[in-house]
Amino acid sequence: MAFTAQQQLRAAELRQLLNRAAHAYYVLDAPEFEDAVYDRLYRELLDLEQQHPDLLSADSPTQRVGGPPAEGFSSVEHRIGMLSLDNAFNAEELQAWDARLGRQLEDNPERQREYVCELKIDGNALALSYADGVLVRAATRGDGSRGEEITANVRTIQAVPLRLQLKQPPAWVEVRGEAFIPDDTFEAINAERQQRGEALFANPRNACAGTLRQLDPKAVAARRLDFFAYTVHLPADEMGPKSQWDALQWLETAGFRVNPHRERTSGADGVVAFYDRWEEQRHQLPYATDGVVVKLDALERQQLAGFTQKAPRWAIALKYAAEEAPSRLLRLVAQVGRTGVVTPVAEFEAVPLAGTSVSRATLHNADRLEELDLHSGDTIVVRKAGEIIPEVLRVLPELRPEGAEQLELPSHCPECGSLLVRESGEAATRCVNSSCPAILRGALRHWVSRQAMDVDGLGGKLIEQLVDRGLVRSIADLYRLDAALLASLERMGEQSASNLIEALAASRQRPWHRLLYALGIHHIGSVNAKTLAAAFPSWEALQSASEEALNELYGIGPEISQSMQQWCSTEANQSLMAELAALELPLASDDSSAESAGAIGALTGQTLVLTGTLPNLSRLEAQALIEAAGGKVTGSVSKKTNYVVAGSEAGSKLQKAEKLGVAVIDEAELKALLS
């Protein structure tokens, strides 16, 4: 049945009224309507939508209650990477970061940098995408590059606006923030679970993460999650905030709940004063916090400071002091990693810390083990560094039992029996047997991981079976497995085996840069692997690359280039690459692949250097555009450089370009080249 114009107008009016009322209640804490009035208006809209389904819209408050259960979550790529933050754990580390940032910005030593301090909410990061003001996608952080699409679940969070409260919303905008569960809600959830005989959540963060991954949005709605927004990303051509402080005000204007406990301050001392105040008062808040997030205020200076591979240089998390607890040491275990490093791990009687039960902690290396002077049966003090990673802080020797033996790392590998080696000047003790089962298991786990070759269905337990039974002795052996053999293994059947064979076959189509990362070469992360693959589009090209050529690449220094050359020159690694080539794995870039690290385009064969701050593009965005057009971005200017792209406050690279006669262009000229 068609709806009338009057019904259409009434539905729009009801949506506007109800969304405004929800914002006033959940965000401003200033209710506009009595509950009975809200319920009557809500019922009227619901009846209209049920009678005329075509009136239903994505921003309707009736969509918050959740639709039918989902079959699963799809993986989505973040338009802008969701990086993590570096941490500081005391005032000295914060001051060192502030000084380092000043040097990177080439500030006068006396200059006090302007910072915005915000409470670090202990929840789960979300990215919310709005098209023409309407929420169209919500995703988890995931690995920073890709997350899970959980839009239906996030629509149930009342503090998340389904439509932005802006008269002229941008065509696209992404808002980031933290979903969390308030303390009283968390206690109520656990009380209900206890009554039903279900396992209790360890802490609100875990409860929030588990809730967001519920397949039934109605179950999510029942948990009453909350949300604070803290970042906005607008298109480059959109006039937006010029500072983090203004960005927070923009978010409030757009209808988001922003944490009120924030402060703009000058210098590290102001940051420390804010931190000290909230470390003392944090338990008075109705939700969990685990520190203070500090951001350089001016967005232009943020761009100038730039990013490392994992985190922005212009922001840091100053974490609260960790909780401590005494425990009794039970045993020392030597754990062998995928690179052969043997790590001492302390196992002790379980103690509650920061909302979870802790019974193991890494001791990192033999030096730390010797420094602690651990003996069997010792009483130790355990804490969680950053309230995440358990560590043994100290030993209480006065409580040591009589006759206790000093604990040391074994002289031989606990996995293969080979003599362990510790090179002069190195902290790490290693097993150097390339056939060690522990090294192989670690290498296989890394190879099949999502950011690497992404082989679905090949988990840790199955890898253990394959290695322990001698069915897989190298990465290459994975591609020699057959379905009949796999089906005979524990917890495997014909269908699971068939699915795994298909997943392995699909992994042969991964681009060259993914394979390069999957090899697990020391210092070669996913970002460096892309850089290397773009510059050297095949194994042969990379193998023959000189150290000088490697060092010219943006983000590649001597440590990385030496590690790469050492790996390439090792006979066992050369044999592995020959096997992978014979098995038709991607040892070269495929320009037809959407994920190809390189591309043929307007800048193919051209070398560019970026310097200064561009008016619209961040350095990472500019680099991505250049590489997508087939160009190469390096970190230094030479006679081989084709263009230097200069923004405001360009430094010595601009001077060197002028001296060498290298063409200097601005952002507009770069875009013209790209087109």
Curated annotation (Swiss-Prot):
It catalyses: NAD(+) + (deoxyribonucleotide)n-3'-hydroxyl + 5'-phospho-(deoxyribonucleotide)m = (deoxyribonucleotide)n+m + AMP + beta-nicotinamide D-nucleotide. One of its GO terms (molecular function) is metal ion binding. Its EC number is 6.5.1.2. Zn(2+) binds at C413, C416, C431, C436. NAD(+) binds at D35, A36, V37, Y38, D39, S84, L85, E118, R141, E178, K295, K319. Residues 598-675 form the BRCT domain. SUPFAM superfamilies: BRCT domain (SSF52113), DNA ligase/mRNA capping enzyme, catalytic domain (SSF56091), Nucleic acid-binding proteins (SSF50249), RuvA domain 2-like (SSF47781). It comes from the Bacteria. Its cofactor is Mg(2+); Mn(2+). SMART domains: BRCT, HhH1, LIGANc. InterPro entries: BRCT_dom, BRCT_dom_sf, DisA/LigA_HHH, DNA_ligase, DNAligase_adenylation, DNAligase_N, Hlx-hairpin-Hlx_DNA-bd_motif, NA-bd_OB-fold. CDD domains: BRCT_DNA_ligase_like (cd17748), LIGANc (cd00114). Keywords: DNA damage, DNA repair, DNA replication, Ligase, Magnesium, Manganese, Metal-binding, NAD, Zinc. GO terms for biological process: DNA repair; DNA replication. One of its GO terms (cellular component) is cytosol. The active site is at K120. Belongs to the NAD-dependent DNA ligase family. LigA subfamily. DNA ligase that catalyzes the formation of phosphodiester linkages between 5'-phosphoryl and 3'-hydroxyl groups in double-stranded DNA using NAD as a coenzyme and as the energy source for the reaction. It is essential for DNA replication and repair of damaged DNA. This is DNA ligase.
